[in-house]
Amino acid sequence: ETNLIYYQIKKELEEKKKEDQTVNISEYSIDNSSDFDTEEFVRDIFVNGNTLPDVLVCMDEVVTECVYQALIDYNQVGNVDVVGFYYSDVILDAISKGIISSAIALDMEEIGRYSINALEEYSSLGHTSSYYSVGQNVITRKNVGTYRTGANQ
């Protein structure tokens, strides 16, 4: 799934760029079997890289939170535009503060509906569709409040 998202982003950027514009896209596969491995990989981007990326697109919650912390730790807030994934309290706070520009969130209500539909289909037919396409939402500073739970508003 991550590769599909990566290739969609790459295709869109290549189609939308101006003729005289150069866009270099790099994909990094992070071993996220432990939070420490993820933190080390993100640290290497900020410490060992010759140049920081202009935009960093995170494909999961752990990487998004690690990048957020690295931006602060290495004094790079405002130097890298970050598109995160999911909406934990940490990520929502980062968006509210303008440290992360936006995050992609799956429509959890739709996931729930599709799950129930799949269970009902499996119960009655003995099988179900192997793929359900779920909607995505973009969380920005303008709409971050709608993603906060009652206690965290």
Predicted segments, located by residue:
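Glycine-rich loop/hinge motif
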Residues: I95
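Paired acidic/hydrophobic, glycine-rich loop segments that form the ligand-binding mouth/hinge
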Residues: L56-V57, S102-I104
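Hydrophobic alpha-helical
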Residues: Q8-I9, N24-S26, I30-L92
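Hinge/cleft segment of the Venus flytrap/periplasmic-binding protein
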Residues: D107-Q153
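Short helix-loop-beta junction
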Residues: K11-D20
